[in-house]
Design a protein with these regions (language model features):
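Conserved hydrophobic/aromatic beta-strand scaffold that supports enzyme active sites
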Residues: 11, 37, 151-153, 175-177
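Alpha/beta catalytic cores of group-transfer enzymes, especially the acyltransferase/condensing modules
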Residues: 124-174
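Glycine-rich beta-alpha junction loops
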Residues: 34, 179-184
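Single conserved hydrophobic/aromatic residue that forms the stacking wall/gate
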Residues: 193-200
Length: 200
């Protein structure tokens, strides 16, 4: 598989999500119509170069490095496709507030997977991208609706394969989001996965 030509661009728009709905701890989540936008460009340089430029809704510009989730997700695509890494730039317009429970980390993971895959002419299937997304995030409730849209229930089958059920979202149900003033990252609350029973 050849490395994409310099200057090739891919635009990816990923929705925010709400998860842990009702009894669906770690397995039931829904996409919301608030989006982060990612534009990936093949740039000069080796696979260790990843330029991430983020513009938040308040106009602030932030930069990220190779430790960023977008880059980590792109690396998973290269590894799975047996592809040598190449230099990428990602310009991100952030509308989803980070560390507020709206799946901002899931948008980064899904965008990195879709963007890296698409810029290489999609060697990996959507099913493989789903597996990679869940593996990176650690649980499916945010990344699955972020990738597929809608309301999704995700669980492992007896054969340990992921099974996804798309649920109807009734027109009478409206999402209302209250964004807290405090920031709380996914990693900061990961202890709940150790103290609560596994439902899915």
């Amino acid at each position: 598989m050849s490395i994409p030509e310099l200057g090739k661009k891919i635009k990816v728009t990923v929705p925010s999500t709400t998860a842990n709905l009702g009894p669906g701890f770690d397995c039931l989540g829904a996409a919301l119509d608030l989006y982060n936008e990612f534009i990936f460009t093949r740039i000069e340089g080796g696979g260790d170069r990843f330029d991430l430029i983020m513009e938040s809704t308040d106009g602030n510009h932030l930069r990220g490095g190779p430790e960023n989730l977008v880059f980590r997700a792109a690396q998973k695509v290269w590894e799975s496709a047996n592809m040598d890494p190449f230099a990428l730039e990602a310009r991100v317009k952030l509308a989803v507030p980070p560390a507020r429970g709206l799946g901002s980390s899931a948008t980064a993971i899904v965008a990195g997977l879709i963007g890296a895959n698409a810029i290489m002419n999609s060697p990996l299937s959507k099913e493989k991208l789903l597996e990679l997304a869940i593996d990176i995030e650690g649980h499916p409730d945010n990344v699955v609706p972020s990738l597929l849209g809608g309301l999704c229930l995700t669980a492992r089958s007896s054969s340990q394969r992921w099974r996804i059920i798309r649920c109807d979202w009734h027109d009478s149900i409206k999402a209302v989001v209250a964004i807290p003033a405090i920031r709380l990252s996914t990693s900061a609350v990961s202890y709940t996965h150790l103290t609560l029973p596994t439902n899915c």
